[in-house]
Design a protein with these regions (language model features):
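Conserved HGGG/HGGXW glycine-rich cap/lid loop of the alpha/beta-hydrolase fold
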Residues: 6-56
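Conserved loop-alpha-helix segment in the C-terminal half of the alpha/beta-hydrolase fold
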Residues: 35, 207-247
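Conserved acidic catalytic loop of the alpha/beta-hydrolase fold
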Residues: 66-84
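Gly/Ala-rich beta-loop-alpha elbow adjacent to hydrolase catalytic centers
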Residues: 88, 92, 96
Length: 289
C-alpha cells in the first residue's frame, strides 16, 4: 500500500515517475492508472499548490507557469525527489515541460498540455470564460451534487467537457472531482490572468533536452489538438507526437489501458540507471486506501 495524504500519493519502487494533474484538479485525477504504474515505478502524484489538499500557493507569487513550477520544485524537494520522469495533464503538462526546461525531468509525457497557445490569439480568454462558467454551474449544483452524480448518464453529461466516458467514474470520485474545483484557492486569480491573456504561455522550449512525448486526446474539448499541439510540435526539440484515439481532455478514465501503455512504453524506453528517490522520514503520513 502506498503512502497517501491530501497533498500527495506515493507508492511503488523503481524509476521515479511524477504525475501532475490539471487546473482545479488534485492527485486523485490519476486514480485509474495509479495501481498499474505503481507496480512498475515509484509513483509520486502531488497535489499542486493552491489546489484541493495541496500546499498553499505563495501569496506574493504571480499566477504564471514559472511561479507554479517554483512552488512545485519546492514540494518535490520536500518529498526527496530530484530528477524524475514527469507525466502531466493539461496545466500539469505545461508544468512538466517547465520542469524539463530546468533539468528536473528525465523524460516528459505531456498529455494535452496547456500553454501551447500564443499570446493574443484569443485562446486564453476563451479558457477564462470556460472555467468561470464551470465554477458558476458547480456552485449552483453543489447542494444536490451527490444525488446528481449517482446516475451514470448524468455523470457522462456533467463531465463531457473533460472526458468522453464520465459514466465510468465512480459516483464518489465524480463528486470529489467536482468539489475540488470549488476548493482551488487560486481559481479566481488564474481566471483573471487568463482573461488578461498574459503569463500562461510556455516559451523557451528549445531549452528542453530530455525526451518528450506529446500525447493529444482526439476529442479534447478544452484544448483542441488542432490549436494547441502545433506550436509544441514545432518548438520542442525532438518531440514525439501521438494521438490518443477516443479520448477527451482528461483521458485516464476514457481508456485506462491506453494511457498506462502510452506512459509505460515511453518511460521504459528512456529509463536511466539513476537510483530511486527516498522520501524524508516525516514527509508523508499514512492514511486511507
Amino acid at each position: 500500500m502506498g503512502e497517501i495524504d491530501p497533498s500527495c500519493y506515493r507508492a511503488g519502487a523503481g524509476e521515479p515517475l511524477v504525475l501532475l494533474h490539471g487546473f482545479t484538479g488534485s492527485w486523485p485525477h490519476w486514480r485509474p492508472v495509479l495501481g498499474e504504474l505503481a507496480a512498475r515505478y515509484e509513483v509520486i502524484a502531488p497535489t499542486l499548490a493552491g489546489h484541493d489538499g495541496g500546499p498553499p500557493y505563495p501569496i506574493s507569487a504571480p499566477i504564471t507557469l514559472a511561479a507554479g513550477a517554483d512552488s512545485l520544485e519546492e514540494h518535490l524537494d520536500e518529498l526527496g525527489v530530484g530528477t524524475a520522469h514527469v507525466v502531466g495533464n493539461s496545466m500539469g503538462g505545461a508544468l512538466a515541460l517547465e520542469l524539463a526546461k530546468r533539468g528536473r525531468a528525465r523524460s516528459v509525457v505531456a498529455v494535452a498540455p496547456a500553454g501551447g497557445w500564443t499570446d493574443g490569439d484569443g485562446e486564453a480568454r476563451r479558457l477564462a470564460r470556460f472555467f468561470a462558467r464551470q465554477l458558476r454551474l458547480t456552485r449552483l449544483i453543489e447542494p444536490r451534487l451527490t444525488t446528481i452524480m449517482s446516475r451514470p448518464s448524468v455523470r457522462r453529461a456533467s463531465l463531457r467537457d473533460i472526458m468522453r466516458h464520465g459514466e465510468l467514474v465512480a459516483p464518489a470520485d465524480a463528486v470529489d472531482m467536482t468539489l475540488a474545483s470549488l476548493r482551488c484557492t487560486i481559481a479566481g486569480r488564474a481566471i483573471a490572468t487568463l482573461q488578461a491573456d498574459r503569463g500562461l504561455t510556455l516559451g523557451d522550449l528549445d531549452r528542453i533536452t530530455c525526451p518528450v512525448l506529446l500525447a493529444s486526446p482526439q476529442f479534447d474539448r478544452i484544448l483542441p489538438v488542432a490549436k494547441h499541439a502545433p506550436r509544441y510540435r514545432r518548438e520542442i526539440p525532438g518531440v514525439e507526437w501521438r494521438m490518443l484515439p477516443g479520448c477527451g481532455h482528461v483521458p485516464m478514465w476514457d481508456d485506462t489501458r491506453l494511457i498506462v501503455g502510452t506512459i509505460d512504453e515511453f518511460v521504459s524506453r528512456h529509463a536511466t540507471d539513476s537510483p530511486p528517490t527516498s522520501p524524508p522520514a516525516a514527509a508523508l503520513s499514512s492514511a486511507r486506501d
